[in-house]
Swiss-Prot record:
Subcellular location: Cytoplasm
Organism from which the protein derives: Chlamydia muridarum (strain MoPn / Nigg)
Stretch list, region Domain I: 1-65
Region called Domain III, residue ranges: 150-200
Entries under HAMAP family matching the protein: DNA_HJ_migration_RuvA
Top-level lineage group: Bacteria
Gene: ruvA
Region (Flexible linker), start-end ranges: 145-149
Protein's UniProt name: Holliday junction branch migration complex subunit RuvA
UniProt lineage: Bacteria, Pseudomonadati, Chlamydiota, Chlamydiia, Chlamydiales
Amino acid sequence: MYEYIKGKLTHTDEAYVVIESFGIGYSIMLSERFLVDLRELMHQEVLIYVHSVIRETEHSLYGFSSRAERECFRLLISFSGIGPKTGLAILNMFPLQELCSVARLENVKAIASVPGIGKKTAEKLMVDLKQKLPALMPLYLEEPVVASSSTTTSFKEGIGALMNLGFSRLAADRMMTEAVKELSEDASVAELLPVALRKG
């Protein structure tokens, strides 16, 4: 089983990307939200955490921006009635942090709004998600998918601020990297953020 795939992003489609690594092209299914971020990185090196689905009629890879998101996906598909496509649809609509809030508030209506999930399935999900999701949050603090060239305090604080505004880790890292290039690594977070937001 693969942990992650690191290579050049060579193709994007409506539901998947192709990553070339050591002469092999890997087709990886992604959420729409993650796809939007990756389209900005065409022909660049990216790292995608993956989950393999192997069946008699299917051998697919599903990709995620972080280990935390992948573990959340694995938790979701462990529930009866939730397959890989539905699990991906849930993560597309609710990033991990937001999904934790939905579960904590037992917002059945929000989960039921995801295509492929009915009210009964949503109600069952709420019970287990409320108990199990918080355990995944420490993973949420891991490094961004695309390693940045800067590890300054301002850079890290900027990424955190952008994520609090709703940007994914990948998008926040890209925006801050571009802001640092435009200004400098010595720039304060107050100087970097306005520039980073323009890059979004």
